[in-house]
Structures are given as structure tokens and as C-alpha cells.
């Protein structure tokens, strides 16, 4: 029969466990893990942290850019509103100036019309005075003529009245 060690060897050769090999493999595996941790895992984790920081910074930068864009948009909207208000004020000022100028033109035209009216009235008055003067001259000459005819012939009161009325009618026709 077989001894116990033979059975272990047979078991190991058939698929059993070989403890000394396993311990050596475990030792080397732990060394491999330590080396991987030091040379691979550490740099890999530092790269991952670096990448995480980079992404976080990019997100923060994007947020800042978005905030700046919003602020610029608000500023532009405020400027646009201010420009609109200024343009509206300029339009209102132009309307007011136009109304003022319109009133000044109307006032000037009225003053000119009043001046022309006064000049026309003065001309009419002068013509009236000349006509009255001419009429007075005519009446005076007729009065002299009547007086000379009266002197030439003595007339009755009726004849004198008739003569005066005739001369007045003549003066009225001469006008």
C-alpha cells in the first residue's frame, strides 16, 4: 500500500494542492501587488485625480463664462434700453423743437400780416385824406364859383338853394 506522502504526491499530481508552490506564488503575487501599487496604481490614481481636477476646473470655467455671458447680456439689454430711452427723448425733444419752431413761424406770419394790414390801413387813410382834401378843394372852388355867380346876379333864396343843390350833385358825380 501506499504511504501517506505517496498519497499527497498522487493527489497533487492528480489535481491536488501543492502548498509550497502556493505559498511561493502568494508571496510573489503580494510583491507584484506592492509593485503595481507603487508603480502603476499610484501614477494611475494621480492621473485620474489630475483628470478629475481638470474636468472640475473646466466645469468651473464654463460656469464663469456662462455667468459672464449672462452679465454681458444683461448689460447689453440695459444699454439697449438706455439707448432706446435716449432715442425717445431725442424724438420728444425734436417734436418739442418742431412745435416751438412752428409756433415761431406762425407768430412771425401773424406779425407780418398785422404789419401789412397796418400799412394797408395807413394807405387807405392817406388816400381817404387825399380824397377829402381834393373834395374840399373842389367844394372851395365851387363855393367861389357859386359866390361869383351869386354876386353877378342876385338870386332869391330858392334860386340859391337850387344852385347849391346842383353844385353838390355835380360834386357827387365827379367823385
Swiss-Prot record:
Subcellular location: Cell membrane
Domain of life: Bacteria
GO cellular component, as recorded: plasma membrane; proton-transporting ATP synthase complex
Segments crossing the lipid bilayer: 22-44
Annotated GO MF terms: proton-transporting ATP synthase activity, rotational mechanism; proton-transporting ATPase activity, rotational mechanism
Entries under InterPro entries matching the protein: ATP_synth_B-like_membr_sf, ATP_synth_b/b'su_bac/chlpt, ATP_synth_F0_bsu_bac, ATP_synthase_B_chain
Pfam families registered for this protein in UniProt: ATP-synt_B (PF00430)
Membrane topology, record value: Single-pass membrane protein
Keywords carried by this UniProt record: ATP synthesis, Cell membrane, CF(0), Hydrogen ion transport, Ion transport, Membrane, Transmembrane, Transmembrane helix, Transport
Family from the record: Belongs to the ATPase B chain family.
Subunit structure, interactors included: F-type ATPases have 2 components, F(1) - the catalytic core - and F(0) - the membrane proton channel. F(1) has five subunits: alpha(3), beta(3), gamma(1), delta(1), epsilon(1). F(0) has three main subunits: a(1), b(2) and c(10-14). The alpha and beta chains form an alternating ring which encloses part of the gamma chain. F(1) is attached to F(0) by a central stalk formed by the gamma and epsilon chains, while a peripheral stalk is formed by the delta and b chains.
Function: F(1)F(0) ATP synthase produces ATP from ADP in the presence of a proton or sodium gradient. F-type ATPases consist of two structural domains, F(1) containing the extramembraneous catalytic core and F(0) containing the membrane proton channel, linked together by a central stalk and a peripheral stalk. During catalysis, ATP synthesis in the catalytic domain of F(1) is coupled via a rotary mechanism of the central stalk subunits to proton translocation. Component of the F(0) channel, it forms part of the peripheral stalk, linking F(1) to F(0).
Protein name per Swiss-Prot or TrEMBL: ATP synthase subunit b
Organism lineage string: Bacteria, Bacillati, Bacillota, Bacilli, Bacillales
